[in-house]
Amino acid sequence: GMRGVREWVAAFSEMTGLREAGSVFLEKEEKAYSEVISSLRPKAEGRKVLFYVRSDADLDWRIDVLTDLGMEVAAVAHWHNRFVEHDGRESTYTGIPRIEGVDICGLREAAEDLGVDLIVSGDARTGRTGYRWVGTSTMYIGREGALDWAEKVVRCLSIKPCEDWYGRGSE
């Protein structure tokens, strides 16, 4: 979402004393973001999402984008973590349920129980569940990164899952 952009522009504007220029820049960025999100929203609105991740680190901007698209984050499922996360960027979205210790073999059941339309995960094995899924990465930062990822989310919602996604019928 635009939260990180807003924070960065505010800090940079304050540091350089270019508050007016920062406001003009941010207004243009917000407008460009809103235009694209508005065009994508009808394709995503009302859909439910399950995150399948190692930790909450760096989830907020993704949750912001999904919220802007009119989507509901049903839960954040964490896979078994074998090390301590030192990132420190825990999600500020504390009202979203967390499901701890979900193995890849239990992901399909968790998704079915929640009635989700899409799984968001950095684990490519997620595709084997038979659910639509989208990765967590984008090649860009800021507005461009948020919009690139939003477009991926919407594209993945339009792909029909097939048996090959979870290993059946491909022998």
Regions found by a protein language model. Name each.
Residues 1-171:
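An N-terminal assembly and electron-transfer interface module characteristic of large anaerobic redox
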